[in-house]
Amino acid sequence: MEAAIERLWLDDTAWVDVARGWLPDADAVYEEVLARSEWRQGRLWRYERWVEEPRMGAWGPSAQQHPALVDAQRQLERHYRVRFPDGFALAYYRDGRDGQAFHRDRDMKWCENTVIALVTLGARRPWYLRPRANRHAHELENKGATHDLQPGPGDLMVMGGTCQLGWEHSVPQLRDRRVGGRISVQWRWTSRTGRQEVTAGYRAPLRFSRP
C-alpha cells in the first residue's frame, strides 16, 4: 500500500484523496470478498411503493473475515489518525444496471468534519461528485456532476472535511449488463462536532402523499 495519495480540493474546506492501485492483489481480493460475504438485497420506499435497492450489501461479522481489508483498515486509521469502530461495509454492484443516486451520507448526523474511505474492487465504473448547488440541475451533463474519478481495481478514494456537507456523490446506473461486477468497501468516521443534520437520509422513505 505504497501508492501515492493525491488530494483534490473541491472547495476551501472539502477534499477527496485518490490513490490509484492502493490495495495490492485487488483482483484476488475481489473474488474472495464476492464469494465469502453474506450479501443481502435492501429495499427502499420510493414512488409510493417498496422497490429493491439496485445493489447488494454486506455488513458486520461476515465482512470481518477478509484479512486484506482488516489490514487496509489499520493502514487508513494510521494515516488519517481516526478510528473506524464499526469496521467496514460492502456494496456490490452486480452489473451496469446497479447503481446509487446522488446523495450525501447524512445518516452520520455530524457532517462538518468527516472521513469516508472507499476502496474499489472489480470493474471500473464512473463515480461522480457534484456540489449541492447543482442538485436540481438535471438538464446539465451527468446531472450536474463536476468530477468523475472513475475508480478501478484497488483504487482508494477518501472524502474528507466538509465533503458530506456541500457535495453529493453517485455511482450512476449504466443500463448495461455487460459491465462487470464492482465492490465498494467503505469505512466512515465523523468528529461529532458542529451542527447535526436533521433532514432525512438517503435510505429514508420518500413520500408524495400522506403515509
In which residue ranges do the predicted regions lie?
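Non-heme Fe(II) oxygenase metal-center motifs and adjacent flexible, charged/small-residue loops
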Residues: 1-211
